[in-house]
Amino acid sequence: MMKKAYIPALLVLLSLLTLCGCHGSRGQNAFSVPDSFDESRQYEITFCAKNDTNKTQVDIYNKAITDFQALYPNISVKLRLYTDYGKIYNDVITNIATNTTPNVCITYPDHIATYLTGSNVVAPLDGLFADERYGLGGSALKYDGPAMEEIIPQFLEECSFSGSHYAVPFMRSTEACYVNKTYVEAL
């Protein structure tokens, strides 16, 4: 699967959140998957992402948004860039009370766990994943979206809290430890 399809896939999956206005404030009704997607209605999605001044990364985000908006002209995506994940976290936490949190953000699972301490702040994605039309691999998607079986189960499990999924693992960092065997044996 081409990497450029990941961000639009994430955006369209999570764009459904705006159909019910569920994007992170305390006391909102619990999220439910809409029966249909009204393409005549205008929607605006705020997408928060980390960028540490990497122009290539910004260009990829902008191209993904442009491509997505060409497919879904009734959805406007507002990109908000941050220099580190901590700033995204602080902004989301601060804006929960004012109902101005983003619809979509790239964040860590432990940050999501903190957001979940509020009532209906983060929408569970299981219903969206399973939606035959707009879910993972959905028939009505206007792009080649990933199917559930194309996502590594262990990565997806890290996005689960109390039996529900709250994130999509389209981006992963791999940590490794390299050891110089010669130096270790010399110790």
Task: List where the protein language model places each region.
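Positively charged n-region of N-terminal signal peptides that target proteins for export
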Residues: 1-5
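Bacterial N-terminal signal peptides
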Residues: 10-18
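Short polybasic/polar patches that bind polyanions
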Residues: 18, 70, 185
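Conserved N-terminal structural module of periplasmic/extracytoplasmic solute-binding proteins
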Residues: 22-121, 131, 136-141, 145
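Short beta-strand->loop
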Residues: 49-52, 167-172, 180, 187
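Extracytoplasmic/periplasmic substrate-binding proteins
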Residues: 57, 185-187
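Hinge/lid segment of periplasmic solute-binding proteins
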Residues: 110-176
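Short, well-ordered alpha-helical scaffold segment located
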Residues: 111, 182-183
